[in-house]
């Protein structure tokens, strides 16, 4: 969607949206693919903080319906572990409860846990995986807080410089981007 000569009308299509469009084109069945994977497209769209307009709005609406009425075992376990009631799922629940826990797997270097959570059909295994993602998210939050405190101590005093470059060899590479964003906002 970002190709200058592409002409695609929705410029804010997330990576999962592009993957969905590719799968739909390869199978020649957008409706079947969306019916099977609307929850995944919803999760990725909201997690990537895409505007909920156009196709993104359709993806999220259909995905939320799936999350409310027929969630995959892993997602159901993650909702339960995060304190979400299926019938009350909305974009905020996805963005502030589910997405950070799923993203924690990648940030903390253990992506297979999230992948298995998406794929498992065993509710007991799903619960164990959801608990692990929640544990990783708490660890990510702790590491983030530590790095943030260290980074703030390193900031120059006085007027804000045009650019700030901070580094520490021990900082976890999966979390420094979040800390950098927080510091840039301040």
Q: Which ranges hold each PLM region?
A:
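Short alpha-helices
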Residues: 1-46
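Hydrophobic helix-and-loop "lid/oligomerization" segment in the mid-to-C-terminal part
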Residues: 27-186
């Amino acid at each position: 969607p970002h190709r200058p000569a592409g002409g695609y009308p929705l410029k804010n299509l997330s990576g999962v949206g592009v993957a969905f469009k590719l799968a739909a084109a390869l199978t020649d069945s957008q409706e079947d693919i969306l019916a099977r994977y609307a929850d995944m497209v919803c999760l990725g769209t909201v997690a990537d903080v895409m505007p909920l307009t156009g196709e993104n709005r359709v993806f999220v609406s259909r995905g939320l319906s799936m999350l409310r009425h027929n969630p995959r075992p892993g997602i159901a376990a993650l909702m339960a572990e995060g304190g979400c009631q299926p019938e009350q799922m909305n974009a905020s629940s996805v963005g502030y409860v589910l997405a950070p826990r799923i993203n924690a797997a990648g940030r903390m270097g253990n992506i297979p846990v999230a992948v298995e959570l998406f794929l498992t059909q065993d509710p007991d295994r799903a619960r164990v995986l959801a608990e692990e993602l929640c544990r990783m998210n708490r660890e990510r939050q702790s590491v983030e807080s530590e790095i943030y405190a260290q980074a703030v101590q390193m900031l120059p005093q006085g007027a804000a410089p045009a650019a700030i470059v901070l580094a520490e060899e021990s900082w976890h590479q999966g979390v420094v981007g979040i800390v950098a964003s927080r510091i840039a906002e301040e």
